[in-house]
């Protein structure tokens, strides 16, 4: 893009002493100049207090610069901080030039801009005087960027000298103008539109604070360069310019950079003061902002009539409000100072951290200076109707924006001095000229607001606003930076400053300028222009509501550059489209959590949600995320005319990496949010000097790990960066900023409070704050759990009621560190709706919801690696009938009805066979017995008991026929409950059958003994196909089982009905009817309760077949954690007397069957594992499970139940079957190699379990694949084919090799006992140095050296041997020395054995305990025994031991005391 000739380099600003008043010079482009060529607002705040004027021509100074006096730096403020404004002193030409340079270096600036920007600020305008510390602090970040951008040109550096805030503010303005001069030149964006709103103390400071100043400086630098402006004029350019400018600035000479950095740091630290100073001085500085928030728009116009007139004219004519930006001076450190300045400042500051521009309508906020209320609606310029919240927020944000918004005529440059924050909470992190129709008009309030808020009059912000105006700005290039405010400032929070990063930013810049113009137009329309008035209040506000995440406590708002790129190209595309779906900046809400940041709580515990999208009114931005927000990230409320507007937005979910949500839509919002400072909630509440350090660490990369400020960062490198893609216009353009991509999680057009039709969760994050309500989150219907948000702050709900109803709440962004929650529906506002994809929860599955899996947990947490594949398949295809209904769109109730019908068919078929075959055969046999005349009474009782079978068959035959009819006509009559209610009398047959069940089964067994014919008939039925090879008793139990199945199915059916429907009441009645019968079964049947339990388990475990088996009894269920390496995954176990169901829980409360383990061949043990507390090992022939219980009692209970379930004849064998002794294995008939051994953990062994050699760097461990022992290479030189490996050769120890050879199986020739020389043949083609060394290592040491002699006493007891009194890990130190060493100890035979590890074969030492005394050490200030105890012999201290806890210590003390006496 043609940048035009570079403007002359402005003279370097004279830096005043840190204690001197600092003058912030804002560069006004010719467009911003008033008709008379004077700065509209210069006289007001500029006159107040001393100000330094850069050495420039008068015309240049007058026209191009506004000097804003700043309050002397505080003593605590860094003295090197220079006026950020110095940087801005550069003439428009030079600024344009710088802008170009910055654009070129934009990317670097994006990375280094923070530091460079600082540097550039210092050299900027010597006349400007010392950079304001506040400006410097914010400037540090901004300056780094600017420095990079400006470093290319000395002039740029000089320009940077201006307060970074001013510079940034001006820059966006300039960029806008420059950008406008590009495609937008026709629109004539006016820099005069730039407004510098006052910012309330700290709250406002965050926008204006160093981060803002920096951004402003960066932007200012970028805009300073005409070429930059030109680049910026491109839709993508603004972002790029910003970033590049920042880079250029950071590229400035090191001295400049240092100065800028200092200034930035100072500015960040002192921003409050600067604002304070500027505000106090700027109280008169209406030139910065013509409209005093308290003053009516007219006053503002009057004060800045020239600028305002020019701006109004420009806006009216060209609607080029793009350029107009509010520059928000850095906030003062103290709210007190800020209050002082506030009273005098032309603009009040909104209590909220930042105000937002309502691009749609910006009403004068001048009067709102006094109160937030007035500020809220009028000042924001947002119609209360549209965004009451915005209005409220705006009001809260401060009259600053209101004032800015008020003046229809926005001064070319409105310098808003930030007053010191009365309180940190009071300070507005960002003062956005929401209400600036004219002043913010260029930015359309959106950008102006962002600029003002951010205090970064940066192109980025302009671009953001332009984007808000739908100006096609390169969102990718736009990066929001969070710059830590001065660590010295108690309440300051790092701010996010949008930066233009890529070259595309330059291209978007023009668009941004246009957007700013359009915004200005919109604002102007508010001012009274008919066209704009009509467009001023679109159905949906177009302003962005920015919520800084970094300002979690302080309420700082992070300005975000949001560029909505129009589908088309050209000015029209760049222009803000006044459509309902246009981006809307309701207002900037302080993340401090209280919209009325009036509360003088510097560190309020509450935090405003970064994104207010879809947060129900009752929840005043309730803190949802439990994890502290460690990265600052803006939340954007964006609506666009995207054709995908009504489409679902798909988002991918990644847990630890930077979230990458890529929105597959034509309109993609690109938002580069480069968060320079990430802080936890505790950090947010503390705004101490330590925060300055964050600039270096995170200002550019957003990632503490990225130390380099040079070069381009990759998207993956900056996890906290956010990018919104609205269009693919910037394809192929490199980012100067690293960003992760976050897709909007919310459907833009969906009506308020309606659950989004999302298949994946959206992320709504709030700044860290009180998270007490986050602990208990009920599961809802989403792939990830939806969170029901309890009303946290109902008292303040009213302020946000309309905001949440606003259609503009379309987009929510989240930082990768935020908690990710699917907020698609809020139970607080509407009853929980179970979606089709959620399986109905049965009342019978609820008792088994032992380990509900949080929706936020990644899928791999739900399933182990072994089951991931199967679980994915199950989730996608085999989720029983519940899957089909998802695909077919059927309701869950219909699915349950179909399941009821299918099971009824099988039941009736079974009844038919039972009635015809079994009942008929038994009746005939009984008749024959009657002829014999023996025991007639018993036969009659048996006949009576079986007589209910035909009646039961008829009952269910009728139920089946009617169910088939109902389901065939389901559309016309969706009900099944009345089928049961109509047959209430028929269920009496079931009740009678149940009452006599046990009795007639006993009679049947007795008669079978006396009547061979009856026994033959029963045996014939059991062996028939109809009998299913099951006993008659089992088949008769199925008759009763059906009632329990009804109970389960009807419960699920009831849970999926609307409580208001008649079917709901009928189902309750049917369920009550069935429950009466089942209760009788539980009371009268011996197996009733067990039968019910088995039915419930069968229903709750997916993948499980028929659990009802003869003799099967339920024993125990519970959840244990499966141990796989370092992973712990929940596993729910159902133990029956013959089988163990191994399942894992699912989100709907049910379980998926993983494996069915037979109890008969199971071996259970309680191994002692260092990192696995309360371990329980379950071994079978097919697998080995290592589980961990929550307590010792739970582990022991499971161990006892499993042991009791084992057959008696198997227990003795099982105990020894896994013993390491090969002889015992063979004696018990357990052949080696037939099943996998239990491998001894490597960490449990420090020496060879065969020869006792200590393992070392050269002597490595090897597992024997036959017995599982760990041996050295000298004891495992052989391989043998093992059965369980399908005769594949595997390494075995010498002992197992000898036993396997005895079996007589031939071993392949080459694999027979290998000589040492053949272990590593030298002829191997892979021979190398390592191979050569292995050759020597392979040589058996026994041939060269004597084996270590080990005393027999140390080999008598193995570390894991049986029969020990106690064993476990203890930490030991010798003779009072506090050097603890963890060892394994075993007490056996009154001797204490010491081992390196729990599986060692040879002890390190043994010490008889006879004669020793044990003295526990009591904890300080307590009479209770601590975990430390000492071992004395007479009065000599031998050892001190330290156990894991006091209980363990007590057990060891008792064991040692027992061993110390005979």
Swiss-Prot record:
Name of encoding gene: FGD5
Biased composition (Low complexity): 676-685
Protein name: FYVE, RhoGEF and PH domain-containing protein 5
Binding-site residues for Zn(2+) 1, renumbered to this chain: 1248, 1251, 1272, 1275
Biased composition annotated in UniProt, kind: Polar residues: 592-611
Pfam families the record matches: FYVE (PF01363), PH (PF00169), RhoGEF (PF00621)
GO molecular function, one term: guanyl-nucleotide exchange factor activity
Keywords, comma-separated and alphabetical: Cell membrane, Cell projection, Cytoplasm, Cytoskeleton, Endoplasmic reticulum, Endosome, Golgi apparatus, Guanine-nucleotide releasing factor, Membrane, Metal-binding, Repeat, Zinc, Zinc-finger
SMART domains reported in the protein's UniProt record: FYVE, PH, RhoGEF
Compositional bias ranges of the Acidic residues kind: 95-106, 137-151, 211-220, 242-255
One record GO biological process: filopodium assembly
Biased amino acid composition, Basic and acidic residues: 72-82, 161-177, 858-887
Location of the DH domain: 892-1084
Binding-site list for Zn(2+) 2: 1264, 1267, 1293, 1296
Subcellular location per the Swiss-Prot or TrEMBL entry: Cytoplasm, Cytoskeleton; Cell projection, Ruffle membrane; Endoplasmic reticulum; Golgi apparatus
Signal peptide from the UniProt entry: none
InterPro entries with a match to the protein in the record: DBL_dom_sf, DH_dom, FYVE_RhoGEF_PH, PH-like_dom_sf, PH_domain, Znf_FYVE, Znf_FYVE-rel, Znf_RING/FYVE/PHD
Record function comment: Activates CDC42, a member of the Ras-like family of Rho- and Rac proteins, by exchanging bound GDP for free GTP. Mediates VEGF-induced CDC42 activation. May regulate proangiogenic action of VEGF in vascular endothelial cells, including network formation, directional movement and proliferation. May play a role in regulating the actin cytoskeleton and cell shape.
Domain PH: 1113-1207, 1363-1461
Region (Disordered): 37-323, 492-512, 592-613, 670-718, 746-777, 851-887
Tissue expression from the record: Expressed in endothelial cells (at protein level).
Span of zinc fingers (FYVE-type): 1242-1301
């Amino acid at each position: 893009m043609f940048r035009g000739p570079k403007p002359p380099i402005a003279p370097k600003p004279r830096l005043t002493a840190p204690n001197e008043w600092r003058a912030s010079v804002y560069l006004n482009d010719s467009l911003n100049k008033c008709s008379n060529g004077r700065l509209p607002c210069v006289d007001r705040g500029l006159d107040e207090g001393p100000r330094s004027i850069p050495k420039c021509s008068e015309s240049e100074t007058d026209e191009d610069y506004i000097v804003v006096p700043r309050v002397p730096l505080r003593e605590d403020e860094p003295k090197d901080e220079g006026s950020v404004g110095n940087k801005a002193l550069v003439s428009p030409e030079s600024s344009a030039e710088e802008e170009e340079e910055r654009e070129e270096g934009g990317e670097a600036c994006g990375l280094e801009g923070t530091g460079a920007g600082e540097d550039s600020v210092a050299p900027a305008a010597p006349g400007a005087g010392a950079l304001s510390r506040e400006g410097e602090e914010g400037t540090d970040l901004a300056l780094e960027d600017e420095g990079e951008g400006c470093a290319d040109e000395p002039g740029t550096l000089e320009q940077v000298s201006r307060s970074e805030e001013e510079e940034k503010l001006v820059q966006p303005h300039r960029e806008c103008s420059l950008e406008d001069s590009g495609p937008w030149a026709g629109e004539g964006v006016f820099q005069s539109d730039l407004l510098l709103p006052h910012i309330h103390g700290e709250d406002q400071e965050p926008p204006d604070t160093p981060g803002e100043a920096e951004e402003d400086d960066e932007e200012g630098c970028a805009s300073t360069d005409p070429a930059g402006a030109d680049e910026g004029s491109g839709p993508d350019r603004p972002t790029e310019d910003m970033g590049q400018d920042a880079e250029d600035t950071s590229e400035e000479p090191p001295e400049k950079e240092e100065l800028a950095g200092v200034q930035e740091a100072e500015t960040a630290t002192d921003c409050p003061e600067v604002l304070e100073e500027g505000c106090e001085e700027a109280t008169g500085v209406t030139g910065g902002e013509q409209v005093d928030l308290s003053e009516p728009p007219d006053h503002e116009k009057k004060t800045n009539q020239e600028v305002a007139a020019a701006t109004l004219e420009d806006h009216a004519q060209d609607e080029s409000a793009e350029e107009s930006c509010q520059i928000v001076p850095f906030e003062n450190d103290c709210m007190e100072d800020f209050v002082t300045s506030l009273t005098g400042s032309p603009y009040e500051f909104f209590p909220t951290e930042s105000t937002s521009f309502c691009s749609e309508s910006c009403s004068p906020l001048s009067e709102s200076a006094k109160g937030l209320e007035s500020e809220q609606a009028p000042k924001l310029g947002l119609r209360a109707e549209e965004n009451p919240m915005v209005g409220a927020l705006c009001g809260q944000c401060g009259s600053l924006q209101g004032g800015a918004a008020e003046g229809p005529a926005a001064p070319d440059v409105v310098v808003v001095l930030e007053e010191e924050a009365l309180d940190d909470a009071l300070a507005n992190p960002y003062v956005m000229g929401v209400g600036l129709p004219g002043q913010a008009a260029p930015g359309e309030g959106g950008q102006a607001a962002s600029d003002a808020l951010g205090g970064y009059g940066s192109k980025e912000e302009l671009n953001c606003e332009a984007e808000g105006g739908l100006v096609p700005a390169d969102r990718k290039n736009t990066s929001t930076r969070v710059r830590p405010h001065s660590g010295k400032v108690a309440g300051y929070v790092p701010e996010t400053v949008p930066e233009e990063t890529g070259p595309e930013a330059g291209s978007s810049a023009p668009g941004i300028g246009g957007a700013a113009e359009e915004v200005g137009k919109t604002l102007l329309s508010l001012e009274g222009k008919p066209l704009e008035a009509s467009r001023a209040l679109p159905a949906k506000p177009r302003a962005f509501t920015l919520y800084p995440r970094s300002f979690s406590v302080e309420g700082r708002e992070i300005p975000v550059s949001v560029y909505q790129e129009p589908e088309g190209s050209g000015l029209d595309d760049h222009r803000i489209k006044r459509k309902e779906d246009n981006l809307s900046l309701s207002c900037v809400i302080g993340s401090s959590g209280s919209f009325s940041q009036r509360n003088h709580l510097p560190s309020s515990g509450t935090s405003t949600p970064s994104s207010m999208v879809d947060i129900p009114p009752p929840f005043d931005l309730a803190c949802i995320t439990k994890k502290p927000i460690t990265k600052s990230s803006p939340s954007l409320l964006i609506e666009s005319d995207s054709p995908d507007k009504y489409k679902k937005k798909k988002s991918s979910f990644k847990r630890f990496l930077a979230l990458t949500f890529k929105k597959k839509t034509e309109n993609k919002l690109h938002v580069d949010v480069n968060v320079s400072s990430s802080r936890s909630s505790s950090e947010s509440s503390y705004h101490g000097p330590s925060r300055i350090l964050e600039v270096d660490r995170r200002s550019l990369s957003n990632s503490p790990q990225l130390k380099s400020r040079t070069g381009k960062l990759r998207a993956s490198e900056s996890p906290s960066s956010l990018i919104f893609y609205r269009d693919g216009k910037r394809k192929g353009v490199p980012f100067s900023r690293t960003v992760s991509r976050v897709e909007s999680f919310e459907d833009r057009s969906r009506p308020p409070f309606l659950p989004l039709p999302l298949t994946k969760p959206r992320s709504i994050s709030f700044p860290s704050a009180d998270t007490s309500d986050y602990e208990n989150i009920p599961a809802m219907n989403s792939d990830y759990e939806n969170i029901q948000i309890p009303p946290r702050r109902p008292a303040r709900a009213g302020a946000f009621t309309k905001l949440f109803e606003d259609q503009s709440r379309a987009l929510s962004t989240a930082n990768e560190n935020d908690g990710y929650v699917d907020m698609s529906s809020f139970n607080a506002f509407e009853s929980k709706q179970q979606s089709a994809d959620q399986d109905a929860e049965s009342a019978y599955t609820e008792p088994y919801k032992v380990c509900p899996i949080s929706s936020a947990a990644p899928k791999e947490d739900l399933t182990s690696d072994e089951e991931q594949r199967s679980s994915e398949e199950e989730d996608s295809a085999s989720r029983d009938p519940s899957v089909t209904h998802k695909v077919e769109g059927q309701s869950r109730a219909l699915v349950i009805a179909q399941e009821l019908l299918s099971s009824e068919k099988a039941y009736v078929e079974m009844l038919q066979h039972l009635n015809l075959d079994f009942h008929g055969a038994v009746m005939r046999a009984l008749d024959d017995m009657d002829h014999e005349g023996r025991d007639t009474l018993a036969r009659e009782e048996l006949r009576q008991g079986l007589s209910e079978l035909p009646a039961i068959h008829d009952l269910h035959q009728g139920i089946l026929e009617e169910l088939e009819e109902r389901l065939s006509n389901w559309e016309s009559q969706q009900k099944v409950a009345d089928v049961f209610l109509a047959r209430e009398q028929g269920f009496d047959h079931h009740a009678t059958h149940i009452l006599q069940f046990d009795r007639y089964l006993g009679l049947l067994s007795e008669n079978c003994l006396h009547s061979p014919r009856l026994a033959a008939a029963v045996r014939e039925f059991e062996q028939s196909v109809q009998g299913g090879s099951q006993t008659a008793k089992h088949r008769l139990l199925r008759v009763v089982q059906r009632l329990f199945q009804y109970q389960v199915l009807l419960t699920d059916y009831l849970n999926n009905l609307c409580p208001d429907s008649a079917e709901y009441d009928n189902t309750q009645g049917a369920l009550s009817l069935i429950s009466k019968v089942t209760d009788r079964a539980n009371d009268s049947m011996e197996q009733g309760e067990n039968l019910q339990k088995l039915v419930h388990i069968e229903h709750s475990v997916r993948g499980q077949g028929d659990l009802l088996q003869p003799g099967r009894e339920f024993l125990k269920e519970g959840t244990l954690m499966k141990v796989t390496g370092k992973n712990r995954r929940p596993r729910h176990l159902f133990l029956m007397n013959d089988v163990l169901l191994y399942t894992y829980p699912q989100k709907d409360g049910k379980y998926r069957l993983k494996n069915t383990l037979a109890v008969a061949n199971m071996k259970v043990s309680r191994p002692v594992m260092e990192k696995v507390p309360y371990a329980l090992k379950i071994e079978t022939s097919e697998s080995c499970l290592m589980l961990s219980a929550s307590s010792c009692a739970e582990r022991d209970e499971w161990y006892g139940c499993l042991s009791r379930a084992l057959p008696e004849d198997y227990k003795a064998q099982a105990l020894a079957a896994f013993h390491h002794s090969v002889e015992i294995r063979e004696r018990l008939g357990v052949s080696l190699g037939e099943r996998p051994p239990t491998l001894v953990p490597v960490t449990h062994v420090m020496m060879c379990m065969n020869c006792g050699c200590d393992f070392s760097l050269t002597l490595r461990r090897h597992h024997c694949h036959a017995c599982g022992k760990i041996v050295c290479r000298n004891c495992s030189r052989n391989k043998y084919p093992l059965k369980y490996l399908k005769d594949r050769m595997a390494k075995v120890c010498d002992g197992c090799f000898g036993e396997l050879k005895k079996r007589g199986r031939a071993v392949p020739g080459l694999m027979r006992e290998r000589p040492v020389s053949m272990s590593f043949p030298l002829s191997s083609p892979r021979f190398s140095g390592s191979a050569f060394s292995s050759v020597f290592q392979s040589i058996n040491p026994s041939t060269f050296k004597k084996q270590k002699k080990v005393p027999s006493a140390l080999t008598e007891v193995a570390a894991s041997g049986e029969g020990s009194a106690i064993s476990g890990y203890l930490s030991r130190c010798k003779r009072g020395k506090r050097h603890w060493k963890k060892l394994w100890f075993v007490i056996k035979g009154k001797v204490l054995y010491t081992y390196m590890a729990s599986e060692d074969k040879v002890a390190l030492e043994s010490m008889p305990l006879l004669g020793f005394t044990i003295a526990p050490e009591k904890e300080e200030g307590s009479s209770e025994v601590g975990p430390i105890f000492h071992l004395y012999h007479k009065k000599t201290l031998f050892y001190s031991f330290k156990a894991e806890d006091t209980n363990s210590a007590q057990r060891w003390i008792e064991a040692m005391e027992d061993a110390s006496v005979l």
